[in-house]
């Protein structure tokens, strides 16, 4: 008998069943996974993130490959203490949106420092990286605009594009991107090309210099989501733009504080005029409470460490290159990754479940 394997994709929104029916079907799937001992999601951790973690189902610590804390800054004493000191000074929360009173001086300081770090004029903060991408795109693009997107961009960006026109380009396909830019010229008010700096799905990089040239040639704006690049790429950790020597040549850079900074939150950095507009029209900022004082202070300290301690980035790359080398020696297919995002592709559904 042919075995049937299901994935989470099989239980996405379907118009054939109502919400309760879909939830019931999905619960049966989860029950089967648990019965088979294949629980892969929502696993309880009893420690913070690190190279090893203590999790449910294991009596001893296990080696961890699940976190994005690239530089280990979530566990540095300096970042912890900065957060503690901020709580003592400001309290546990801003308790208001930034636009109406939750805008602390350390929020302003972080905006200025992160904007300068990624080579932009100004920045706006968000409570999550997801909110940064989704919020700014909802604010900037409407029915008379179009987004030209790489198929591997983050889901958070896709969430912000539901009210505008979308055209998918091939992954790093410069020829097709140019073709589409020619086709849409003069048809839309705003043309925005959206790419990642480092693509987490397969670990490769965007062809940023060439894409910048195409955007300038065909008068399109460019948004770079550098969630996996900032803190990691470039001689000083300033991201994919620094790696390619393209700082200051990108219209909008977005990022998250949940990866190299070891915390939580997100930002967008752009020209002063664009940021001023977003501070009033990016709904995920305007209608969300500001980041907590602890989070903001810890991020500021993390940014300070990233600037002053290049050796932690060097160590990350040493570990990355060692793991890549050993995996290849053992015959694993890790694709075309050139970043700390290493992908292992297994040959069968059965292997993927192990």
Which stretches of residues belong to each language-model region?
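N-terminal "arm"/small-domain region of PLP-dependent enzymes with the aminotransferase-like
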Residues: 1-10, 23-90, 220
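Active-site phosphate-binding strand-loop segment of PLP-dependent enzymes
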Residues: 69, 171-224
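Conserved N-terminal alpha-helix of the aminotransferase class I/II PLP-enzyme fold
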Residues: 81-128
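Conserved PLP-dependent catalytic core of the aminotransferase class-I/II
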Residues: 206, 300-338, 342, 346
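Substrate-binding/gating loop at the entrance of the active-site cleft, primarily
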Residues: 128, 149-163
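Single conserved hydrophobic/aromatic residue that forms the stacking wall/gate
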Residues: 344-354
């Amino acid at each position: 008998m042919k075995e049937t394997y299901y994935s989470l994709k099989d239980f996405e929104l379907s118009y054939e069943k109502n919400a309760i029916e879909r939830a019931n079907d999905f619960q049966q799937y989860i029950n089967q996974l648990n019965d088979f001992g294949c629980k892969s999601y929502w696993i309880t951790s009893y420690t913070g993130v690190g190279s090893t973690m203590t999790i449910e189902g294991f009596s001893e610590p296990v080696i961890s490959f699940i976190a994005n804390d690239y530089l280990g800054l979530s566990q540095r004493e300096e970042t912890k203490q900065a957060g503690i000191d901020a709580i003592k000074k400001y309290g546990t929360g801003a308790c208001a949106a930034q636009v109406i009173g939750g805008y602390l001086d350390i929020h302003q300081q972080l905006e200025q420092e992160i904007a300068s770090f990624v080579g932009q004029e100004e920045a706006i903060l968000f409570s999550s990286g997801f909110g940064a991408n989704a919020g700014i795109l909802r604010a900037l693009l409407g029915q008379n605009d179009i987004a030209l997107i790489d198929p591997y961009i983050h889901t958070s960006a896709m969430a912000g594009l539901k009210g505008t026109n979308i055209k998918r380009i091939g992954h790093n396909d410069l020829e097709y991107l140019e073709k589409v830019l020619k086709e849409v010229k003069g048809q839309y008010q705003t043309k925005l090309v959206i790419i990642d700096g480092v693509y987490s799905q397969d670990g490769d990089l965007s062809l940023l210099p060439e894409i910048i040239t195409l955007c300038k040639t065909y008068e399109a704006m460019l948004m770079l989501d550098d969630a996996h690049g900032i803190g990691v790429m470039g001689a000083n950790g300033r991201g994919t733009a620094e790696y390619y020597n393209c700082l200051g040549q990108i219209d909008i850079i977005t990022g998250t504080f949940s990866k190299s900074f070891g915390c939580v939150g997100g930002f967008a950095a752009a020209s002063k005029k664009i940021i001023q507009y977003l501070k009033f029209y990016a709904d995920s900022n305007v209608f969300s409470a500001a980041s907590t004082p602890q989070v903001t202070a810890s991020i500021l300290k993390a940014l300070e460490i990233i600037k002053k301690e290049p050796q932690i980035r060097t160590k990350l790359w040493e570990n990355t290159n060692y793991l890549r080398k050993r995996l290849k020696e053992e015959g694993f297919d890790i694709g075309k990754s050139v970043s700390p995002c290493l992908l292992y592709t297994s040959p069968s559904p059965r292997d993927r479940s192990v």
